[in-house]
Amino acid sequence: MWAYESVFYQIYPLGFCGAPFENDGVLEHRINKVSEWIPHIKKLGANAIYFSPLFESDTHGYNTRDYCMLDKRLGTNEDFKNICQELHENGIKIVLDGVFNHVGRGFYQFQDVLKNRENSRYKDWFHISFEGNSNYNDGLWYEGWEGNYDLVKLNLGNEEVVQHILNAVKFWIDEFDIDGIRLDVAYCLSPEFLHRLRNYCDGLKNDFFLVGEMLHGDYNQRMNDSMLHSATNYECYKGLYSSFNSMNMFEICHSLNRQFGAENWTIYKGKHLFSFVDNHDVTRVASILSNENHLPLIYTLMFGMPGIPCVYYGSEWGEKADKSQGDQALRPSFEQPIENELFKHISKLADIKKNSTALNYGDFSTILLTNKQCVIKRCVDTETVLVCINEDENNYYANFNVSANYIDLLTNKELRVENGFEMKAYSSYILKLV
Protein backbone atom coordinates (compact mmCIF):
# COMPACT_ATOMS: atom_id res chain seq x y z
CA MET A 1 0.00 0.00 0.00
CA TRP A 2 1.50 3.31 -1.16
CA ALA A 3 0.25 5.17 1.92
CA TYR A 4 2.46 3.16 4.27
CA GLU A 5 5.54 4.63 2.57
CA SER A 6 4.22 8.18 2.28
CA VAL A 7 4.50 11.51 4.05
CA PHE A 8 1.24 13.46 4.10
CA TYR A 9 0.62 17.20 4.00
CA GLN A 10 -2.76 18.39 5.27
CA ILE A 11 -4.46 21.40 3.73
CA TYR A 12 -7.73 22.88 4.98
CA PRO A 13 -8.76 24.38 1.61
CA LEU A 14 -11.34 26.97 2.69
CA GLY A 15 -8.88 28.49 5.14
CA PHE A 16 -5.76 27.91 3.04
CA CYS A 17 -7.35 29.70 0.09
CA GLY A 18 -8.75 32.59 2.14
CA ALA A 19 -12.43 31.86 1.45
CA PRO A 20 -15.12 33.67 3.48
CA PHE A 21 -16.60 31.62 6.32
CA GLU A 22 -20.19 31.94 5.10
CA ASN A 23 -20.90 30.53 1.66
CA ASP A 24 -21.94 33.61 -0.27
CA GLY A 25 -22.51 31.66 -3.49
CA VAL A 26 -20.00 33.81 -5.38
CA LEU A 27 -17.74 31.78 -7.65
CA GLU A 28 -14.05 32.44 -6.99
CA HIS A 29 -11.23 30.28 -8.37
CA ARG A 30 -9.28 30.20 -5.13
CA ILE A 31 -8.33 26.50 -5.29
CA ASN A 32 -5.69 27.37 -7.89
CA LYS A 33 -3.54 28.60 -5.00
CA VAL A 34 -2.67 24.95 -4.32
CA SER A 35 -0.77 24.90 -7.61
CA GLU A 36 1.48 27.72 -6.41
CA TRP A 37 2.46 25.69 -3.35
CA ILE A 38 3.37 22.45 -5.13
CA PRO A 39 7.11 23.29 -5.28
CA HIS A 40 7.07 23.97 -1.53
CA ILE A 41 5.20 20.75 -0.79
CA LYS A 42 7.65 18.74 -2.89
CA LYS A 43 10.62 20.43 -1.25
CA LEU A 44 9.17 19.53 2.14
CA GLY A 45 9.19 15.92 1.00
CA ALA A 46 5.45 15.27 1.18
CA ASN A 47 4.23 12.90 -1.50
CA ALA A 48 0.55 12.84 -0.51
CA ILE A 49 -1.98 15.57 0.31
CA TYR A 50 -4.96 15.16 2.60
CA PHE A 51 -7.52 17.82 1.72
CA SER A 52 -10.04 18.75 4.40
CA PRO A 53 -13.56 19.30 2.97
CA LEU A 54 -13.76 21.19 -0.30
CA PHE A 55 -17.23 20.40 -1.63
CA GLU A 56 -20.19 22.78 -1.54
CA SER A 57 -21.16 23.47 2.07
CA ASP A 58 -22.95 25.98 4.29
CA THR A 59 -19.85 27.30 6.09
CA HIS A 60 -16.83 25.28 7.29
CA GLY A 61 -16.98 22.37 4.86
CA TYR A 62 -18.32 19.72 7.21
CA ASN A 63 -21.93 20.85 6.63
CA THR A 64 -22.15 19.58 3.05
CA ARG A 65 -24.70 20.82 0.53
CA ASP A 66 -23.53 18.84 -2.51
CA TYR A 67 -21.02 15.98 -2.53
CA CYS A 68 -20.29 16.37 -6.24
CA MET A 69 -19.71 20.11 -6.62
CA LEU A 70 -16.58 21.95 -5.55
CA ASP A 71 -17.44 24.73 -3.14
CA LYS A 72 -18.08 27.90 -5.15
CA ARG A 73 -15.79 29.77 -2.79
CA LEU A 74 -12.97 27.55 -4.11
CA GLY A 75 -13.83 27.29 -7.80
CA THR A 76 -15.22 24.72 -10.19
CA ASN A 77 -14.85 20.98 -10.59
CA GLU A 78 -12.70 21.67 -13.64
CA ASP A 79 -10.38 23.80 -11.49
CA PHE A 80 -9.94 20.99 -9.00
CA LYS A 81 -9.56 18.39 -11.73
CA ASN A 82 -6.63 20.41 -13.09
CA ILE A 83 -5.11 20.67 -9.60
CA CYS A 84 -5.38 16.90 -9.13
CA GLN A 85 -3.77 16.27 -12.49
CA GLU A 86 -0.89 18.61 -11.63
CA LEU A 87 -0.40 16.97 -8.24
CA HIS A 88 -0.28 13.53 -9.82
CA GLU A 89 2.20 14.75 -12.43
CA ASN A 90 4.40 15.81 -9.51
CA GLY A 91 4.16 12.43 -7.81
CA ILE A 92 1.71 13.54 -5.11
CA LYS A 93 -1.22 11.32 -4.11
CA ILE A 94 -4.61 12.81 -3.17
CA VAL A 95 -6.87 11.94 -0.23
CA LEU A 96 -10.18 13.76 0.26
CA ASP A 97 -12.25 14.24 3.39
CA GLY A 98 -15.38 12.10 3.26
CA VAL A 99 -18.03 13.62 5.53
CA PHE A 100 -20.60 10.84 5.41
CA ASN A 101 -22.07 10.89 8.92
CA HIS A 102 -23.90 14.19 8.48
CA VAL A 103 -24.67 17.00 6.05
CA GLY A 104 -25.55 20.69 6.27
CA ARG A 105 -29.00 22.21 6.49
CA GLY A 106 -28.49 23.41 2.91
CA PHE A 107 -28.32 19.81 1.63
CA TYR A 108 -30.96 19.57 -1.12
CA GLN A 109 -32.68 16.49 0.30
CA PHE A 110 -32.98 18.07 3.76
CA GLN A 111 -34.37 21.27 2.29
CA ASP A 112 -36.98 19.14 0.54
CA VAL A 113 -37.98 17.64 3.90
CA LEU A 114 -38.33 21.10 5.45
CA LYS A 115 -40.55 22.14 2.54
CA ASN A 116 -42.67 19.02 2.04
CA ARG A 117 -42.49 17.44 5.49
CA GLU A 118 -44.24 14.02 5.60
CA ASN A 119 -44.72 14.14 1.82
CA SER A 120 -41.00 14.43 1.09
CA ARG A 121 -39.51 11.37 -0.60
CA TYR A 122 -36.35 12.06 1.41
CA LYS A 123 -37.89 12.02 4.89
CA ASP A 124 -36.25 8.67 5.65
CA TRP A 125 -32.79 9.96 4.70
CA PHE A 126 -32.57 11.50 8.18
CA HIS A 127 -33.66 10.75 11.75
CA ILE A 128 -36.79 12.91 11.97
CA SER A 129 -39.87 13.32 14.16
CA PHE A 130 -42.63 15.52 12.78
CA GLU A 131 -44.13 15.79 16.25
CA GLY A 132 -41.20 17.75 17.68
CA ASN A 133 -39.30 20.93 16.90
CA SER A 134 -35.68 21.91 16.25
CA ASN A 135 -33.39 24.64 17.51
CA TYR A 136 -34.16 26.41 14.23
CA ASN A 137 -37.94 26.26 14.90
CA ASP A 138 -38.50 24.11 11.81
CA GLY A 139 -41.68 22.55 13.17
CA LEU A 140 -39.99 19.16 13.16
CA TRP A 141 -37.23 17.49 15.16
CA TYR A 142 -34.14 15.94 13.60
CA GLU A 143 -31.00 14.38 14.99
CA GLY A 144 -27.93 16.60 14.76
CA TRP A 145 -24.42 15.28 15.18
CA GLU A 146 -23.52 15.41 18.89
CA GLY A 147 -26.13 18.13 19.46
CA ASN A 148 -24.92 20.35 16.60
CA TYR A 149 -28.06 21.08 14.63
CA ASP A 150 -26.24 22.69 11.74
CA LEU A 151 -24.95 19.14 11.11
CA VAL A 152 -27.89 16.94 10.10
CA LYS A 153 -27.22 13.27 10.80
CA LEU A 154 -27.74 10.97 7.83
CA ASN A 155 -29.61 7.68 8.12
CA LEU A 156 -26.94 5.27 6.90
CA GLY A 157 -29.41 2.44 7.39
CA ASN A 158 -31.27 3.74 4.35
CA GLU A 159 -30.11 2.12 1.10
CA GLU A 160 -30.81 5.28 -0.92
CA VAL A 161 -28.48 7.27 1.35
CA VAL A 162 -25.72 4.69 1.06
CA GLN A 163 -26.08 4.62 -2.73
CA HIS A 164 -25.93 8.42 -2.83
CA ILE A 165 -22.62 8.33 -0.95
CA LEU A 166 -21.16 5.50 -3.01
CA ASN A 167 -22.10 7.35 -6.20
CA ALA A 168 -20.27 10.42 -4.88
CA VAL A 169 -17.16 8.33 -4.18
CA LYS A 170 -17.26 6.92 -7.70
CA PHE A 171 -17.64 10.47 -9.04
CA TRP A 172 -14.56 11.60 -7.09
CA ILE A 173 -12.50 8.74 -8.50
CA ASP A 174 -13.80 9.11 -12.07
CA GLU A 175 -13.60 12.91 -12.14
CA PHE A 176 -10.52 13.66 -10.02
CA ASP A 177 -8.71 10.28 -9.90
CA ILE A 178 -8.28 10.55 -6.12
CA ASP A 179 -6.25 7.93 -4.25
CA GLY A 180 -8.07 7.70 -0.94
CA ILE A 181 -10.57 9.08 1.55
CA ARG A 182 -10.26 10.24 5.13
CA LEU A 183 -13.51 9.35 6.89
CA ASP A 184 -14.69 12.17 9.15
CA VAL A 185 -15.91 10.98 12.59
CA ALA A 186 -15.33 7.37 11.53
CA TYR A 187 -16.07 6.33 15.11
CA CYS A 188 -19.72 7.29 14.41
CA LEU A 189 -19.95 5.23 11.22
CA SER A 190 -21.29 1.72 11.53
CA PRO A 191 -19.00 -1.23 10.80
CA GLU A 192 -21.56 -2.38 8.23
CA PHE A 193 -21.27 0.89 6.30
CA LEU A 194 -17.46 0.86 6.44
CA HIS A 195 -17.36 -2.74 5.25
CA ARG A 196 -19.61 -1.81 2.34
CA LEU A 197 -17.49 1.24 1.52
CA ARG A 198 -14.25 -0.76 1.59
CA ASN A 199 -15.60 -3.43 -0.75
CA TYR A 200 -16.92 -0.78 -3.11
CA CYS A 201 -13.68 1.21 -3.20
CA ASP A 202 -11.55 -1.91 -3.64
CA GLY A 203 -13.57 -2.64 -6.76
CA LEU A 204 -13.07 0.85 -8.18
CA LYS A 205 -9.33 1.41 -7.78
CA ASN A 206 -6.35 -0.64 -6.66
CA ASP A 207 -4.68 0.42 -3.40
CA PHE A 208 -7.43 2.92 -2.62
CA PHE A 209 -6.59 4.18 0.88
CA LEU A 210 -9.18 4.58 3.65
CA VAL A 211 -8.19 6.30 6.90
CA GLY A 212 -10.70 7.05 9.63
CA GLU A 213 -10.89 9.76 12.25
CA MET A 214 -10.77 7.82 15.53
CA LEU A 215 -10.42 9.42 18.96
CA HIS A 216 -10.70 6.86 21.76
CA GLY A 217 -11.26 3.17 22.24
CA ASP A 218 -10.07 0.24 20.17
CA TYR A 219 -9.26 1.38 16.64
CA ASN A 220 -9.38 -2.26 15.49
CA GLN A 221 -13.17 -2.12 15.59
CA ARG A 222 -13.03 -0.11 12.38
CA MET A 223 -9.41 -0.55 11.23
CA ASN A 224 -8.99 -4.05 9.87
CA ASP A 225 -8.72 -6.08 6.67
CA SER A 226 -12.36 -5.47 5.72
CA MET A 227 -12.84 -1.82 6.73
CA LEU A 228 -10.29 0.99 7.21
CA HIS A 229 -6.60 0.66 6.38
CA SER A 230 -5.62 3.23 8.99
CA ALA A 231 -6.91 5.45 11.80
CA THR A 232 -5.83 8.75 13.34
CA ASN A 233 -3.56 8.08 16.30
CA TYR A 234 -5.01 10.52 18.82
CA GLU A 235 -3.58 8.51 21.71
CA CYS A 236 -0.03 9.20 20.55
CA TYR A 237 -0.88 12.76 19.47
CA LYS A 238 -1.55 13.56 23.12
CA GLY A 239 1.37 11.44 24.31
CA LEU A 240 3.83 13.23 22.05
CA TYR A 241 3.35 16.80 23.26
CA SER A 242 2.61 15.77 26.85
CA SER A 243 5.84 13.78 27.08
CA PHE A 244 7.83 16.87 26.18
CA ASN A 245 5.88 19.35 28.29
CA SER A 246 5.94 17.17 31.41
CA MET A 247 9.49 15.91 30.76
CA ASN A 248 8.15 12.38 30.90
CA MET A 249 9.11 10.25 27.91
CA PHE A 250 7.56 7.28 29.69
CA GLU A 251 4.12 8.46 28.54
CA ILE A 252 4.69 8.29 24.79
CA CYS A 253 6.80 5.15 25.05
CA HIS A 254 4.08 3.46 27.10
CA SER A 255 1.56 4.22 24.35
CA LEU A 256 3.93 3.07 21.60
CA ASN A 257 4.77 -0.17 23.42
CA ARG A 258 1.07 -0.77 24.08
CA GLN A 259 0.29 -0.24 20.42
CA PHE A 260 3.30 -1.67 18.58
CA GLY A 261 5.59 -3.42 21.08
CA ALA A 262 7.17 -6.85 20.72
CA GLU A 263 4.71 -8.71 22.95
CA ASN A 264 1.94 -10.71 21.32
CA TRP A 265 -0.78 -8.73 23.12
CA THR A 266 0.12 -5.35 21.61
CA ILE A 267 -2.95 -4.03 19.84
CA TYR A 268 -1.81 -2.48 16.53
CA LYS A 269 1.33 -4.45 15.68
CA GLY A 270 1.83 -4.54 11.92
CA LYS A 271 -0.69 -1.77 11.32
CA HIS A 272 -0.05 1.76 10.10
CA LEU A 273 -1.80 4.48 12.08
CA PHE A 274 -2.02 8.10 10.91
CA SER A 275 0.45 10.15 12.99
CA PHE A 276 0.31 13.90 13.62
CA VAL A 277 1.37 16.55 16.13
CA ASP A 278 -1.43 18.96 15.17
CA ASN A 279 -4.23 19.44 12.66
CA HIS A 280 -7.17 21.72 11.83
CA ASP A 281 -9.02 20.87 15.07
CA VAL A 282 -6.33 21.38 17.73
CA THR A 283 -3.81 23.93 19.00
CA ARG A 284 -0.75 24.09 16.76
CA VAL A 285 2.24 22.19 18.08
CA ALA A 286 4.43 25.33 18.21
CA SER A 287 1.88 26.83 20.61
CA ILE A 288 1.19 23.78 22.75
CA LEU A 289 4.85 22.97 23.44
CA SER A 290 6.17 24.89 26.44
CA ASN A 291 9.77 24.82 25.17
CA GLU A 292 10.45 25.79 21.55
CA ASN A 293 13.67 23.75 21.60
CA HIS A 294 11.48 20.65 21.59
CA LEU A 295 9.84 21.49 18.26
CA PRO A 296 12.31 19.69 15.96
CA LEU A 297 12.55 16.82 18.45
CA ILE A 298 8.82 16.09 18.48
CA TYR A 299 8.86 15.85 14.69
CA THR A 300 11.82 13.45 14.80
CA LEU A 301 9.94 11.21 17.19
CA MET A 302 6.74 11.43 15.14
CA PHE A 303 8.55 10.44 11.94
CA GLY A 304 10.56 7.75 13.73
CA MET A 305 7.73 5.95 15.49
CA PRO A 306 5.43 3.48 13.67
CA GLY A 307 2.84 5.21 11.54
CA ILE A 308 2.14 7.45 8.56
CA PRO A 309 3.32 11.01 9.36
CA CYS A 310 1.17 13.99 8.41
CA VAL A 311 2.26 17.65 8.59
CA TYR A 312 -0.39 20.38 8.88
CA TYR A 313 0.13 23.32 6.53
CA GLY A 314 2.00 26.16 8.24
CA SER A 315 3.32 24.01 11.05
CA GLU A 316 6.36 23.05 8.97
CA TRP A 317 7.78 26.47 9.77
CA GLY A 318 6.44 26.67 13.34
CA GLU A 319 3.28 28.72 12.86
CA LYS A 320 1.43 29.32 16.13
CA ALA A 321 -2.30 29.31 16.92
CA ASP A 322 -4.36 28.30 19.93
CA LYS A 323 -7.66 26.43 19.84
CA SER A 324 -9.08 29.01 22.28
CA GLN A 325 -8.83 31.62 19.51
CA GLY A 326 -11.44 29.71 17.50
CA ASP A 327 -11.31 27.32 14.57
CA GLN A 328 -10.62 30.02 12.01
CA ALA A 329 -7.37 30.93 13.80
CA LEU A 330 -6.23 27.35 13.26
CA ARG A 331 -7.08 27.47 9.55
CA PRO A 332 -5.57 30.68 8.14
CA SER A 333 -4.46 31.74 4.70
CA PHE A 334 -0.73 32.39 4.21
CA GLU A 335 0.52 34.56 1.38
CA GLN A 336 3.74 32.60 1.00
CA PRO A 337 5.24 29.49 2.59
CA ILE A 338 8.27 29.93 4.85
CA GLU A 339 11.30 27.67 4.55
CA ASN A 340 13.30 28.01 7.76
CA GLU A 341 15.43 25.60 9.82
CA LEU A 342 12.41 23.66 11.08
CA PHE A 343 11.22 23.26 7.50
CA LYS A 344 14.64 21.91 6.50
CA HIS A 345 14.61 19.49 9.44
CA ILE A 346 11.18 18.12 8.54
CA SER A 347 12.21 17.89 4.89
CA LYS A 348 15.17 15.74 5.92
CA LEU A 349 12.92 13.58 8.10
CA ALA A 350 10.52 13.08 5.19
CA ASP A 351 13.33 11.97 2.91
CA ILE A 352 14.61 9.53 5.54
CA LYS A 353 11.15 8.12 6.22
CA LYS A 354 10.21 7.53 2.60
CA ASN A 355 13.45 5.65 1.97
CA SER A 356 13.62 3.53 5.12
CA THR A 357 12.08 0.07 5.16
CA ALA A 358 12.69 -0.10 8.91
CA LEU A 359 10.78 3.13 9.59
CA ASN A 360 7.95 2.17 7.23
CA TYR A 361 7.51 -1.46 8.24
CA GLY A 362 9.92 -2.30 11.06
CA ASP A 363 9.31 -3.77 14.49
CA PHE A 364 9.27 -1.40 17.46
CA SER A 365 11.07 -1.65 20.79
CA THR A 366 12.48 0.70 23.42
CA ILE A 367 16.12 0.16 24.34
CA LEU A 368 16.64 3.20 26.59
CA LEU A 369 14.08 5.21 28.51
CA THR A 370 14.38 7.92 31.15
CA ASN A 371 12.19 10.92 31.94
CA LYS A 372 14.02 13.12 29.43
CA GLN A 373 15.57 10.67 26.98
CA CYS A 374 14.53 7.73 24.88
CA VAL A 375 16.09 5.48 22.27
CA ILE A 376 13.70 3.41 20.19
CA LYS A 377 14.65 0.66 17.78
CA ARG A 378 13.00 0.01 14.43
CA CYS A 379 14.18 -2.99 12.48
CA VAL A 380 13.55 -5.37 9.62
CA ASP A 381 15.85 -8.14 8.42
CA THR A 382 17.69 -5.78 6.08
CA GLU A 383 17.83 -2.57 8.15
CA THR A 384 18.13 -1.44 11.77
CA VAL A 385 17.47 2.15 12.84
CA LEU A 386 17.73 3.81 16.26
CA VAL A 387 15.67 6.96 16.89
CA CYS A 388 17.23 8.89 19.77
CA ILE A 389 15.76 11.86 21.64
CA ASN A 390 17.29 14.06 24.35
CA GLU A 391 14.79 16.69 25.47
CA ASP A 392 17.04 17.93 28.29
CA GLU A 393 18.95 21.22 28.28
CA ASN A 394 22.12 19.27 29.15
CA ASN A 395 24.16 16.71 27.28
CA TYR A 396 23.37 13.12 28.22
CA TYR A 397 25.35 9.92 27.85
CA ALA A 398 22.89 7.31 26.62
CA ASN A 399 24.15 4.06 28.08
CA PHE A 400 22.74 0.97 26.39
CA ASN A 401 24.11 -2.40 25.41
CA VAL A 402 24.99 -1.79 21.76
CA SER A 403 28.42 -1.51 20.15
CA ALA A 404 28.45 -0.92 16.41
CA ASN A 405 29.02 1.61 13.65
CA TYR A 406 26.09 3.79 12.62
CA ILE A 407 25.43 6.66 10.28
CA ASP A 408 23.27 9.52 11.51
CA LEU A 409 20.79 9.97 8.68
CA LEU A 410 20.03 13.53 9.81
CA THR A 411 23.64 14.66 9.32
CA ASN A 412 25.04 11.85 7.12
CA LYS A 413 27.93 11.54 9.59
CA GLU A 414 29.30 8.23 10.83
CA LEU A 415 29.05 7.51 14.55
CA ARG A 416 30.69 4.78 16.60
CA VAL A 417 28.41 3.57 19.39
CA GLU A 418 30.25 1.83 22.26
CA ASN A 419 27.69 0.74 24.84
CA GLY A 420 25.88 3.95 24.04
CA PHE A 421 26.92 7.46 23.03
CA GLU A 422 26.67 11.07 24.17
CA MET A 423 23.61 12.99 23.02
CA LYS A 424 23.84 16.75 22.87
CA ALA A 425 21.34 18.99 24.64
CA TYR A 426 18.00 19.30 22.84
CA SER A 427 19.05 16.81 20.19
CA SER A 428 17.67 14.01 18.07
CA TYR A 429 19.37 11.35 15.99
CA ILE A 430 18.27 8.75 13.48
CA LEU A 431 21.06 6.18 13.46
CA LYS A 432 21.21 3.51 10.77
CA LEU A 433 23.32 0.44 11.42
CA VAL A 434 26.14 0.28 8.88
Name each model feature, range by range.
Residues 114, 184-267, 301, 320-348, ...:
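Active-site-proximal helices and loops of the catalytic beta/alpha 8
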Residues 1-50, 56, 81, 86-87, ...:
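Carbohydrate-interacting/catalytic domains
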Residues 1-7, 12-47, 54-175, 197-203:
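Substrate-binding/active-site clefts of carbohydrate-active enzymes
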